[in-house]
Amino acid sequence: MNTVSPETVQAPDDDPWADWLLHQRSAGDPVYEMRIQARVAGYIDHALQRLPQTTPTSLLDFGCGDGALGLRALQRWPSLRVVFADPSLELLRRASARAEAAGVHARCRFVQLGPRGLDDLPDASFDAVLTRSALAYVPDKPRLLAQWHRLLGAGGAISLAEPIFRDEAVAACAQRAALEHAADDDAARLLRLLHRWRAHQFPDTEQALAESCHCNFSERDLFAWAAQAGFGDLRLELHIESGPSLAPDWDRFTRHTPHPYAKSLRDVLDWECGAEERTLLEGLLRHSWEQGRIVSVERMAYLSARRP
């Protein structure tokens, strides 16, 4: 773990998280990005409101990305100091620039996460840990929760907002299983194309699901792991919301990916389909898009707890 001045360090060329957060999630469209940021702000506000520690003075923003959560917390609590921690140097650079623009840089520290994770931070360093869409991508979640417990002083608290992708992966597995016994007709052909798209975004076998750190857990697992780590006063909410895609047009919809390890629909159409298959799949999906029949479903788990 290194404390860095992100502006003075050369970022590596290969940075999938920065590429996704800054470009791919909104397909490079500013209108789409504004809509996404507005939705993310809602997730952040709910996580902040659920924090049991009402007036924290030291906070760890784990997996801070571009700093959206920590900056919101600094705005909410004028005496707060925040450590922004992320493996991506480019995203730390973006968070640092945003903190400077907001006039709160003096209350910030930026830490690049390395192979040792949080091991180098001393015990009881913080009275709050917050994270959004970061724990989901950590392979050893129980260990990380135990680390957060160590980093908090007595009475310290955590508040998490994490996406739950397990249902999408289970659906992909079920779709694959159904296709193994499907007849060779037009309906099965179309289902195979839809499955091809889904399988490039979520694991579609039981083994792949078990090995996928961002899909192989549920909100109940988060609750159980936090309890095992020694946290008390646990509260869990699962929000499931459906609605139209935030993408402003068909092209941006095809170029969006739900997470950094997924391929976009456009990639699948262009690189994984033959000409006839591409015409069939894109024709069906575009018609559904234009009719407003494509619905986005988001599952977000909010977990808060306190260190006794």
Residue ranges: model-predicted function:
Residues 1-55, 68-72, 76, 91-94, 159-196:
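Conserved class I S-adenosyl-L-methionine
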Residues 127-140, 164:
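A short SAM/SAH-binding and catalytic strip from SAM-dependent methyltransferases
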Residues 142-154:
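A short glycine-rich, Lys/Arg-flanked "PGG" loop and its adjoining helix->strand segment in the class I
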Residues 214-229:
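Short alpha-helix
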